[in-house]
UniProtKB/Swiss-Prot annotation:
Monooxygenase that promotes depolymerization of F-actin by mediating oxidation of specific methionine residues on actin. Acts by modifying actin subunits through the addition of oxygen to form methionine-sulfoxide, leading to promote actin filament severing and prevent repolymerization. Involved in exocytic vesicles tethering and fusion: the monooxygenase activity is required for this process. Residues 1796-1855, 1894-1960 form a coiled coil. Residues 772-834 form the LIM zinc-binding domain. Residues 2-498 are annotated as: Monooxygenase domain. Residues 1299-1314, 1358-1368, 1649-1660, 1718-1729 have a biased composition (Low complexity). This is Protein-methionine sulfoxide oxidase mical3a. InterPro entries: bMERB_dom, CH_dom, CH_dom_sf, F-actin_Monoox_Mical, FAD-bd, FAD/NAD-bd_sf, Znf_LIM. It comes from Danio rerio (Zebrafish). Its main location: cytoplasm. The gene is mical3a. It is found in: Cytoplasm; Cytoplasm, Cytoskeleton; Nucleus.
Amino acid sequence: MGDGGVNAVGEGVNQSHMLFDRFVQATTCKGTLKAFQELCDFLELKPNEYRVFYHKLKSKLNYWKAKALWAKLDKRASHKEYKKGRACANTKCLIIGAGPCGLRTAIELGFLGAKVVLLEKRDAFSRNNVLHLWPFTIQDLRGLGAKKFYGKFCAGAIDHISIRQLQLMLLKVALLLGIEIHVNVEFKGLIEPPEDQENERIGWRAEVHPRTHPVNELEFDVIIGADGRRNTLSGFRRKEFRGKLAIAITANFINRNTTAEAKVEEISGVAFIFNQKFFQDLREATGIDLENIVYYKDDTHYFVMTAKKQSLLEKGVILHDYADTEMLLSRANVDQKALLSYAREAADFSTNHQLPKLDFAINHYGQPDVAMFDFTCMYASENAALVRQRNGHKLLVALVGDSLLEPFWPMGTGIARGFLAAMDSAWMVRSWAHGSSPLEVLAERESIYRLLPQTTPENVSKNFSQYSVDPTTRYPNISLHQVRPNQVRHLLDTGETRDLRVDLENVVNSSTPKLTRNESIVRSSKLLNWCQRQTEGYRGVSVSDLTTSWKSGLALCALIHRYRPDLIDFESLDEKDVEKNNQLAFDVAEREFGISPIMTGKEMSVVVEPDKLSMVMYLSQFYEMFKDTVPPGENQNLSPEEKAALIASTKSPISFLSKLGQSIAISRKRNPKDKKEKELDGLGKRRKTSQAGQSEDEELQRANRDDRPSIATALAERKIDSAAAANNNNKVKSMATQLLAKFEENAPTQSTGLKRQGSFRKEFPQNIGGSDVCFFCRKRVYVMERLSAEGKFFHRSCFKCDYCGTTLRLSSYAFDVEDGKFYCKPHYCYRLSGVAQRKRPAPAAAPANAKEPQVLAVSPNTVDAPGQAITTQTPAERRPSETEVNGVTEPSVAKRLKGTPERIELENYRLSMMREEELEEVPEETLAEHNLSSVLDKATDIEEGSSSSESDMEEEDEDAEAAGPSDLGGVPWKEAVELHAKLKGESDPGADDDGLHDGDGEMDEDEEEEEDEEDEDEEEEEESSEEPCEEDDDPEAEAGSPDFEPGTEIDQEDIPSDAEAEARSRCIDEVVTLPVDNDKTESQGQVFNTAEKTSANPRELIVDVVLSPIQKPALPIEEVHEVSPVVLVKSPGARFFPEPYLPDKVKQNIPPPQSPDVKTPHSPVAQIIALSPICSQPVPQPGTASPKSPVQPQPCACSPTGNPLSPICTQSQPCNEPPSPLSTSSPVRTQPVPAVTSTPLAKPASENRTNEHLKDSTPELKKTDLIEEFWLKSAEIRKSLGLTPLERSKTAVEKSIVKTPTPESSSPKSYTPEDLSEEQKPTFTGRSIIRRINITLEGQVISPVEPKSNGSEKKDLSSSSGLGLNGSVTTSQTAASDSYNNSDSTMLTPPSSPPPPPPREEPACLQNKKSQVSWDNLLEGTEEPKSETMPIKPRTPVSPPQPKQKPVTAPVPTPRTNPPVVMRVKEPNKPRREEVRKSFVECVDEIPFADDVEDTYDDRTPDASGLEKFYTPPTSKVNRDKPPLHLALAMENGKPNIPGVSRTAKGSQHFSPEAKEIAEERMRAREKSVKSQALKDAMAKQLTKMKDSEVAKGAVAKVAWDIPETKGKSKKQSKAQKDSAVKALESKKQADTLPDRFFSTPSSKALDSSVTSSESSTGGKSKKRSSLFSPRKNKKEKKAKNERLSSTEETPPKHKSLWKAVFSGYKKDKKKKDDKSCPSTPSSSTTGDSGKKKDSPLDRSSDLRLRRNLSFSEDSDLSCDDVLERSSQKSKGDSVYVPHALAFKRSYATKKTYTEEELNAKLTRRVQKAARRQAKQEELKRLHRAQMIQRQLEQVEEKQRQLEERGVAVEKALRGEADYWGESNYSEILDLHLGGMGKKDDPKLMQEWFKLVQEKNALVRYESELMIFARELELEDRQSRLQQELRERMAIDDHLKTEEELAEEKQILNEMLEVVEQRDSLVALLEEQRLREKEEDKDLEAVMLSKGFNLNWA
């Protein structure tokens, strides 16, 4: 074919490369096909030459990007099974459907060398629904080059992808392999080979539409159905797995990829299954009642929820309650608007109102992408393949995907099993091509298919890299010959009579499962004989029948006594006391064996003869239980061992569960599991319930006992739950509750209704007593459907919670003896609340009850309306359950045969839409344009869509976008597209300005892969903010370009404020004030412009903007936005003008924000708190106004105050100030700071700035306000996050404020305490400002005027911030004593923003090291630094108080105070300033912490714990000793490492062995982060206790600091440690310039390292660590800078570096680009560092040396991971390729920057990520297991309902109740036995009855086992959550805790121990049962399988 056009090498080659890129990047189906066609045309290739196409393409396309893809595909194609593409060389395959499974099958067949033709009826991929991916699926797709096509593919912890993206990816691979793909072609049917084969041998062909299509002429050997339909290919019988009514709603919202959105936690597969409280809150708040909800962030925000019918009716989504599901969910019966608002409300609530704008994406009809469908029934094909043979031609027919096996979508089973089936089918085609006989091929395929429904992520082979088409590589214990060829004869269709049967059965499923198991008691004679043998020899017992012989009760007692003589004293029984004897037997059987009674003793004594059917049911359970047990013989003197064995063998899991439940219930708010369990059993065996008499009383008492405690527990738990819920950590009990609630819920209400319908008790036979009347509805209860609990008998569907109307399960309910009512466990505590409390629930309950009658009433309609067409369906298909309510066949059956629920829904949608209006399909491009506009706008270049390079810019972008696209929600799509184009235009420029955006995005993507899920969410946002920082970070960038001026950098560093902004946004979202939105929009516009103007500061601008909108009303936001941009611009300018004036302005700007914030807090603070912490802070509108004036005054003060420094400040702020909005902008900034989750840290930063400003002017009040606001906001945020520490934080804040005044006074020195306190408030607000100032300062290192004190202040503030982040670190930062104080403050800060604490802690440690360095300098300079009030020099002496404050501060948000301490004028030297800068960096670190908070959040539920930890450790330890300061600092640095260890130890102490590992890891991480010595000590002890491994770690830590294991004593602990720390400090002191840095580096780094490692352990921490690292470096840099005050510019870069380091480190964690950023961050710190290093190589060497030490110690503490991470980070940082100038600067800075700190941070991050990922995986596994159990329970329930229906039919026939006829779907059963009418003992009917009883018993047992598994899972989940909470609590020193807290800790520990105990006993019980019933289980499994009860299909 020649090279044709390619000969013009240059152009041709480039053209081909461009075409290839276009193909790879195509985002639509049509676009992909078009690009591929162009590429082939250009290269002169013909895809239909499938055998050589791929090889020719490869040879002609010599392009490096393509080669990477070829390498992937070649590796896959090299599998030996493919035989180099010749395995199926002559096979022609037709695949119907281009869904993921069809494409995947095509790819496998392509590799095998077959000719593959794929038909797709549409030409657009429009399904945004998101699929959860199992690990092997991810690996499989990566192996096909997924990341080459879709860079964001499963980056970091992401494990999901939209169907659309997956289809595009696979489509491209298929095209490259030469697979023919035809779109707009619909398969109509198969054309058999003609009979006349002599003239022309024509094989099987397909009939397709359009008829002229060439595919009509092709012949095929294999046809595979992959279109998701059930009847495209005939001959496949279906099994139906019916759960209770399940209505799913899916919704896709536009994802604008803003930082705010990125921060919102995903809700994984079944995360909320365990969080019952969340669903209750949702219901009470909105009236929406869900079973579960899943949220994935992808191209869209994808939500899928299972809604309860009742709530859909109440909310008006469903208009009329029809029994038939299809009618129920038909378009005519659904109010579309109500559905949209329902979905939006649920999505909004479940994400804590943090998604800024929920605008629906559009589907391919241009309608909002919301769908509601019924997945009550899941279908599976009974066989996977068949062979059709006609006229000498064989055709292999197979199914894959949903057609084969419908998935349980929340668990990702669809795509995972779909891919497995695709490979299995390819393997079958391979065998077919190899000439195996059709029966052998089919037998092997069916053997493999039997495994498919059971596959889970856990039981597939773990060696994913070895997966191939060969099934043995994928299924661990597979037998390819399980099914024998003669068993699949029916699958070989030769065209004879069999077809008819196959097709018929396709429609009608046999309704009665066949029993394969030995029909043990099918004959009553067998049961009778067994009973006679067992009761032989007992006095007064003569069993001759199954009725009268049992009336006295002696026979029952004898039966029990035979096996358990210890339970009944048979000799004492009186034959005449019939009632007592029977009641005793019933009670004992229920209590000990879990066999529910079928009546009461009283009833038994009254009836003439017991009911035979009931007795058969009851006695058969004894038979099932004891038939394989050998009775204990005549000798009753059993040895204890024998007795134990006997008891074990006769112990029922249910009875055990019930007992266990009791204790557990008490500890948890769960209910007495006792009853539950029994009931559970009872559930299975409806009739078995507790007897009325004693057993009932006992049970009641027990219930009361359980329940009361359970109430108390419930209350206690409620607290935990809220925290947990906030953190998405659901408690086990929640899990159990929810599980149970779900299990119970909506149970088959319909069915009952139906049953009851006909069963109104006309006249009960004489022998029927109270047990035949339903306790709830007073109607007749038949034996088979009887359930009993607490001595009451009822229908399953009548068993509802009295409060909420949820259907209960016997295994999980609560009973109130006093009012005789039943409750679900979650609502038991409401039972006394009465109607008053009912509010929402009541309606639900009523409806629940009303439901039945309603259903009944409706049923006729249903029958009439839907019935006609559908009635034709066979009974089997209708299923009683389906039809139950009406008794009419379900109309939906016909349709159901065709497609999956979603598909049917879509079809319905289309039909109805076409009727309503002419609907044109929207082109895929338009869809993408609308739905993915934000992605396209912002991140076209960056696949990730999170451009780290322009975090500010991006935020701006996003906000603007939010303003624009967000409005698209209601806009018609065409307008939307236009709008989008405009918006795109707007945002793009900004993005362009931020050159980094692109590169960063890429990097982010890579790094994301490494990042944790937690990081991920935040990562995107952080990335944005971080990237700019990174730019700034690079010293080169900073120094080199005005844009990146230090000041600017710092401003951008405000980006940390990005995180804040995000947090704020979140808060704002929560607050959700329209003004904010409007403002956002307006300000966004401004911001955009600004951003465009200053690409360097885009991030900052954006952050401010975002924050501002979030924080406050439109005006403030607008102002803020404006200011921000100005500031950014100025920043660069600031560098230019470092004159005092500029500094003043800068300061002014900063203070104004503070001041506005402050002011705002005064008035708005309360509001803010109410609204949301974040919102509040930004909200202060009044503040904004006020701040303006204060700002101006401040500038005046500032100008004089900070000459060099002020210039720095000015740098960024002078420009800002110029515009009137400047002040506004500063408030905005301030707001951003508070917004930061790690608000506390940010606040300190603000404080520093504020202090400076305050000194300059009187913005102190504002500061105070700001601080207050900040605290309030942070508290609010915390609250919203579910962090308990909020309140504490608040308290801390107040106290902190008190102390802060000192720092503040430092800044205004003359301020009074009140002023100070006010200042403090502003400090909070000021934090963001401080950040700016610090940045500027660092950048210029000039603010000597306010300078030293200001610089110090700044340092302190930042330190304080840092402390907030990591108390210890911050402490370290300030002067020796100061640093102690700082620690205190820091600790306080953490309380203020609990989520960030853990990360903070680490950063704190890191910072501490830096601080130490700083401190040394400070100490040298002045010992004053100790004074808590950094701002006031006099206060400097206050340092001693600082130590005090430390403790005090710890509780209070002293962070501000600490910052003041840091501010000590002592540091007045430039070094001091440098320190300030560091502190600022730390502040920045803190800011990132906001994001971190999220991480932390994820990491550990209790934010409060983290905060508390911070409080204590840092404060008390470091602050105390001034001289020891160095030592203390060093120790603290070491300590963080050690704390990790000790913490670990502590954790292990409390945890069970299982939890030990995780606990240890977490402990370690925490330790590192822990600031306080006490805490550390405790942790150290804990760790040592915890494990030997921990000891090793501790040793390492010791090595690092030469500290003994006792961390708590870290100061004393090891003199070596102290020495090292001291030395480091001294070093710092020695060389304020270089040494300072050097020391700072060593101690700082060591600390950093330890912090890092701890951070890596904890997700959140890792991010912070990164920040911390940079801050340390920054501090060093700062010192160096201070030393060389003259090099202001360098200082600013350093400052920037610090800030960036903080931010970029944070982001880095998140993304690879971020990784670069990280290096940048390090470079940031190093940048400052770098600059310093440049200035003084000495610094660098010392840094390195220090680093070495540090890394060692860190390693010890952090463990090798840190070192590894460090090195990897280093290499990563060095090697990171960023294509932009900024990137270059960044990389340059990175190289320099990549100090051990940075590396450590990175390593830590990585370690943390790994740990977080591990924890998340464990949680996901639990969730998946819970989901499966839930699904199985639902199926069991459905099966039971069907059994009950049949049982009722049989019972009625046996009793001769003729009204039976009209009601049952089982008339066929009775038709068989018409002759038996009225004959009680009709043998056939009795036989049927026995069968049913046996099946029911099997189900009951199965169900009880499931409940035990659920219970075990619940306990496991509970334990892990308790461990987490405990770990967090223990991170705080005991002396910092109140008595109550200590008591709570003890309580948690006790509860955990109890849980562990219960788990052990459960596990033991299960194990015993396993062994004992191994054989029996095989039987049971066989029975279940034979009945189609395979419960693993879900």
